[in-house]
């Protein structure tokens, strides 16, 4: 598609600088409003902004390090998606690190941002060519994938149901990853846009991102972003479909760790999405991109890097908002120029930075931030995961939002860090979506004091991001002039709305924290998705493209976009208002009413649940969209199963999630059909993008069939396939037809009907998606109400194009359709939407329906809540809305509801009508439900409704109870009165007959009176609804006109861009030709010079050869002469040397002879002297020897004589001594003669004693040895005893552990068995639903009992898409 632009370190540096600058600008300002709309600057967010900015700085630093990781995922895909992906990856990695470094909340926000940023970047890449179309498709698909992935990851601590749903979501994710790769990219961008403090907002942002992705893809000129912002909300609702994250919501609520996982997973998902979008989505994106890419590719390639840098350049939200306003006013011209300038400046990194400071510079920053921030966002997302945990723990709802709204997480984190993070994130990667979010928050801030402020802070961060997005969008506008901006506004708006919604939900639904968390995260995500629609103005054109594909969905989106286009940045505040109007508490209606119609900011507590649910629904729709987009996944039961998960039933908001899961089941929403089917078509076509018309025709049956145009859908203003598209839609259709590449725009139908996905989701949820079982299971009355309110908000989003549709939808609203058979389609759609059992399920026993969560009374409430969902978008107002629409008994509620409806109507045109119709619908629904639904089911539904809104009794239940009480009770009283009144005098028979007649007449009168009262009440409600519808229609018409004007401007700008591209292309071709000519000349000259050189070389060689030969001869002669002379000289020298040598030899010989003679003489003389001296000495020695011998002989003789004499004397002396001693001995020994015997006896005794002693010693030794052995043995015994004790203790411990493990094993086996049974049941339900969907006649209404309000509505009402959609069930 486009050449991937590798993010530069300088880009990261720029991003860091931009973020710091953004923090400086954003520290004091947390813009909560659209740039065009009231800018609600939350100073409170300043800390968050600072934190965010700092974190962004860190993030950027980290991005450099982490960038490889994200870039690894995204780079592969980003190569296809374009250079933006890389920046996105790097940014996301950096953001991730930054997120880690920042506070956990800030991390949550960053995670959202990272996810959104990466997706956005990816989307931007994919969409660079077909900026709007590509953006939208990429964004929608990316968001879908991201959501799917996020869903897959989010179910961290999710119950089995949640896990099952998560698994299905993951499957959807896998399918949609391929489809929504581009969408993920878009989502990534949007995600950075919506990393608002509120994690829910983040999720909304994410949810919105798909829509935003569509929106940005469709973003015509960046200036359209203002309108797109409101549209973003619409898209965000549509994107909420993407909320196949019901499990994600619950997962969020389940655990921050889940959130973390989700965040990381989302990054991966973004990568996968990016790759998918790069590959599968390229079919759409490439088609769109292929057309626009040629022109934009060059600019984007040049600018892609610049854009990455722009991403690095973070523009302060306030600046971005302020400049965004200015830019929106001068968006077309200035934005582009600034984009270019910013891009150019950003390429140098230093130049763009100052420009980023400028409004357009900021816009460029926003756009680039989309890309660069995308990287940062990915990082942020990773980092956010930990942050998300804190966010989840700190703010359960926000935590949820952080999961779902990793993109919007900064909002969830609006804590002290949230402000900083908002600023940073806004600066970094939230600029696209956040810019709008900031705008939306203004209205929200006005409407909501606390929650709204909190939400606004989140939105404010989102707005900052949105502003940044605006800045970024311009740069993208250059590269993807149309894509980034729309993404930004839409994302911002939907995020803002979702933030509001989340805030309200947080404040109001603290008790619903789990559900709210899930739903809010889903809503946040939806908002994220919706935020993406913020660029609906740009998207408006794109929406048109989508519209052809999914007329209803497209139309709704188109209307929304038209409204958005009509109301630029100003629209976002209206969007907030519209959200508020869409039962302003119903924050999801932010997207629903992206139109410039200001909606009163009602408490969003109610709105939050609805919006959350709506967001979830959108996300679900998105999931479905993804499912459809990928391999026509919507029919896949896997997706349905996860959606069917019963846990959703527990959570009203989970309903939306379940809807998301349901959507993939193959209940093609109009949006999914448009968004995903188109991608599927394109994918199926093998990357060939068919014209939107072809796609529309192709998917028309799906749109008509699976697309259950529930009352919510109708209310949302989504035109059924039959409904004509709004002007903008038509234009988009034309564009789509003209530009198959724009089918991407179509592929995200939500973009057209941001809310419709929610409506479809609700309708589908209630009707076919989960098969009623899962749907009713998932949505309690409260959930259904939320769904209805979300639908209504979605319808509010859709009003621009689908005002007519809205009218038909409203006429088909449960009140009108259910009451009046004429609105059969609406009744059908309302039934599923309101939670009524689908026609097929109406036959199911009440117990079964109740088990599924489909209670007649509840569904009636849901139907009315579809409209009342608009007015009762706040969870509070859900029951009230039902009673208001369905029951005139609650005048106060009615009054509030009409006002809500009026805002709704204003926002979505259809909602007012739906509200008026809703009352009749409710009144009708209660009776039919009571008739068709067992009391138990009704009671369950009523209980759900009562639980949600005990004050407001469901109209059906009230009507049924009233009717039942009066019919049986009053008639009896009247009979008694008749008896008393008639005198007993007449004949008893006559009296009896008269009494009976009177009683019958009275009963008939009572019935007629009641009917008349009901009809009057319905008439009043219908009048109010039509008034609201008229106001909304006018509003949307005006908005549509403004959108058309903007569309024209955008088309002009696009034409200019194309002209420029063509000019540059021609110039490039010319230069190429010149280059080729010069190359040819050069080659010829080189050849000529080569030949010339060769000739010269040969000539030179010959000349040198001759010279060499001559020189050789001369040198040889000289050498010969020299040799001769040298030889002569040598000979002479030899002769001389020989003569001198001979003379020397003779002289030496003579000298030698003389010397020898002298030496011989000396030797002889010395020998003679030595001989004479020797002889003399010998003689002397002989003489001396003789003398000595003689003297010694004399001495020897003398001594011999003396020794003999001495021997004789000694012998004599010895003899004398011996004799003497013998005598003495005899005398002395006489007394001792017996001593010897005594000695012998003593010796014997001693020997005996010695033997005894030896024996004793031996025994002692043996005993000592034994003692030693005993000591050793005792020690060994002690050791063995200790060992034995240790072993016993271990045995005891092992026994305990074994018991515990066995118990755990048993429990696990039971759990597995239960899980298996549940899976089987869900599979059966899924198969049943799939069978019903497959076998259901798309054109014929379901055969309901003639008394069934749905049946009557469908039979009497004109064949509307709603009826068609109802039939698929």
Swiss-Prot record:
Residues 821-834, 1348-1369 have a biased composition (Low complexity). Residues 801-1150 are annotated as: Localization to the growing distal tip of microtubules. Residues 641-980 are annotated as: Mediates interaction with MAPRE1. The keyword Nuclease does not apply. One of its GO terms (cellular component) is intercellular bridge. Detected in embryonic stem cells differentiating to cardiomyocytes. This is Microtubule-associated tumor suppressor candidate 2. Keywords: Coiled coil, Cytoplasm, Cytoskeleton, Microtubule. Residues 937-947 have a biased composition (Basic and acidic residues). Residues 180-262, 374-442, 477-509, 582-627, 791-839, 861-992, 1331-1369 are annotated as: Disordered. Residues 991-1335 form a coiled coil. The keyword Coiled coil applies. In the C-terminal section; belongs to the MTUS1 family. Binds microtubules. Together with MAPRE1 may target the microtubule depolymerase KIF2C to the plus-end of microtubules. May regulate the dynamics of microtubules at their growing distal tip. Residues 246-262, 392-401, 804-814 have a biased composition (Polar residues). GO terms for molecular function: microtubule binding; protein homodimerization activity. It comes from the Eukaryota. Homodimer. Interacts with KIF2C and MAPRE1; the interaction is direct and probably targets MTUS2 and KIF2C to microtubules. Residues 801-890 are annotated as: Sufficient for interaction with KIF2C. It comes from Homo sapiens (Human). It is found in: Cytoplasm, Cytoskeleton. Signal peptide: none annotated. Its main location: cytoplasm. The lineage of its organism: Eukaryota, Metazoa, Chordata, Craniata, Vertebrata.
